[in-house]
Amino acid sequence: MLTELEKALNSIIDVYHKYSLIKGNFHAVYRDDLKKLLETECPQYIRKKGADVWFKELDINTDGAVNFQEFLILVIKMGVAAHKKSHEESHKE
């Protein structure tokens, strides 16, 4: 039986593959597909930055695609923001 963390990790991998496989590559999410991913999977976290800004920030090796390791940067930043928001909401109560 998987732990909650293992389930969450599998979910992250599944989301990445959902968008990487649009163009048939397990290892690359391209600019237009990253935009779809951001708009669909994490709309509240892209308000301040557009998809093009995110793409430039995430495509560290400048190969024109976001690989899984680069994608994890987005996941970490979203996680930090969600954690911060959870504390802000708990202080409002």
From Swiss-Prot:
Q: Name one GO biological process term.
A: positive regulation of peptide secretion
Keyword match Metal-binding: yes
Q: Which GO terms describe its molecular function?
A: arachidonate binding; calcium ion binding; calcium-dependent protein binding; microtubule binding; RAGE receptor binding; Toll-like receptor 4 binding; zinc ion binding
Q: Where is the signal peptide?
A: none
For this protein, the record's SMART domains field holds: S_100
Q: What triggers production of this protein? A: (Microbial infection) Expression is highly induced in CD14(+) monocytes, neutrophils, and developing neutrophils of patients infected by SARS-COV-2.
- In the record, S-nitrosocysteine modifications are located at C42
Q: Fetch the CDD domains from UniProt.
A: calgranulins
Establish whether keyword Ribonucleoprotein is in the entry: no
Subcellular location(s): the record lists:
Secreted; Cytoplasm; Cytoplasm, Cytoskeleton; Cell membrane
Show the Pfam families listed in the entry.
S_100
Which annotated residues bind Zn(2+)?
A: H17, H27, H83, H87
Membrane topology label: Peripheral membrane protein
What are the residue boundaries of the EF-hand domain, all occurrences included? 12-47, 46-81
What is the reported tissue distribution?
A: Calprotectin (S100A8/9) is predominantly expressed in myeloid cells. Except for inflammatory conditions, the expression is restricted to a specific stage of myeloid differentiation since both proteins are expressed in circulating neutrophils and monocytes but are absent in normal tissue macrophages and lymphocytes. Under chronic inflammatory conditions, such as psoriasis and malignant disorders, also expressed in the epidermis.
**Outcome when changing C42A:** Loss of antifungal activity
Keywords noted in UniProt? Antimicrobial, Apoptosis, Autophagy, Calcium, Cell membrane, Chemotaxis, Cytoplasm, Cytoskeleton, Immunity, Inflammatory response, Innate immunity, Membrane, Metal-binding, Repeat, S-nitrosylation, Secreted, Zinc
User: Which annotated residues bind Ca(2+) 2?
Assistant: D59, N61, D63, E70
Q: How is its activity regulated?
A: Calprotectin (S100A8/A9) activity on TLR4 signaling is inhibited by paquinimod.
* A cellular component annotation (GO) from this entry: intermediate filament cytoskeleton
Name the residues that bind Ca(2+) 1: D33
Further information: Binds two calcium ions per molecule with an affinity similar to that of the S100 proteins.
- Purpose of the protein: S100A8 is a calcium- and zinc-binding protein which plays a prominent role in the regulation of inflammatory processes and immune response. It can induce neutrophil chemotaxis and adhesion. Predominantly found as calprotectin (S100A8/A9) which has a wide plethora of intra- and extracellular functions. The intracellular functions include: facilitating leukocyte arachidonic acid trafficking and metabolism, modulation of the tubulin-dependent cytoskeleton during migration of phagocytes and activation of the neutrophilic NADPH-oxidase. (Microbial infection) Upon infection by human coronavirus SARS-CoV-2, may induce expansion of aberrant immature neutrophils in a TLR4-dependent manner.
Q: How does it assemble?
A: Homodimer. Preferentially exists as a heterodimer or heterotetramer with S100A9 known as calprotectin (S100A8/A9). S100A8 interacts with AGER, ATP2A2 and with the heterodimeric complex formed by TLR4 and LY96. Interacts with GAPDH. Calprotectin (S100A8/9) interacts with CEACAM3 and tubulin filaments in a calcium-dependent manner. Heterotetrameric calprotectin (S100A8/A9) interacts with ANXA6 and associates with tubulin filaments in activated monocytes. S100A8 and calprotectin (S100A8/9) interact with NCF2/P67PHOX, RAC1 and RAC2. Calprotectin (S100A8/9) interacts with CYBA and CYBB.
**Which protein are we looking at?**
Protein S100-A8
Q: Which organism is it from?
A: Homo sapiens (Human)
Q: List the gene name.
A: S100A8
